[in-house]
């Protein structure tokens, strides 16, 4: 029986020694949002809980200030 081993996920913010995630850094925030505008969960991205909370807060602030869309599926 062959086992399938997945590559271990790592937190990008820990690796880069980020102190706090900024809501004005739109390029970084867009990597953690799906095409429909949802925040990607940490079990998929590998982000640690501390940074996932900061990420969610930053995304919500950016949405409130119209820096990010709430959804991309406007018809």
Curated annotation (Swiss-Prot):
An MF annotation (GO) of this entry: small ribosomal subunit rRNA binding
Species of provenance: Baumannia cicadellinicola subsp. Homalodisca coagulata
Function: Binds as a heterodimer with protein bS6 to the central domain of the 16S rRNA, where it helps stabilize the platform of the 30S subunit.
One Pfam family recorded for the sequence: Ribosomal_S18
Chain segments annotated as transmembrane: none
Family: Belongs to the bacterial ribosomal protein bS18 family.
UniProt lineage: Bacteria, Pseudomonadati, Pseudomonadota, Gammaproteobacteria, Candidatus Palibaumannia
Family matches, as SUPFAM superfamilies: Ribosomal protein S18 (SSF46911)
One GO location term (cellular component): cytosolic small ribosomal subunit
Gene from which this protein is expressed: rpsR
Subunit text: Part of the 30S ribosomal subunit. Forms a tight heterodimer with protein bS6.
UniProt keyword terms in alphabetical order: Ribonucleoprotein, Ribosomal protein, RNA-binding, rRNA-binding
Protein name: Small ribosomal subunit protein bS18
Cysteines paired by S-S bonds: none
GO BP annotation list: translation
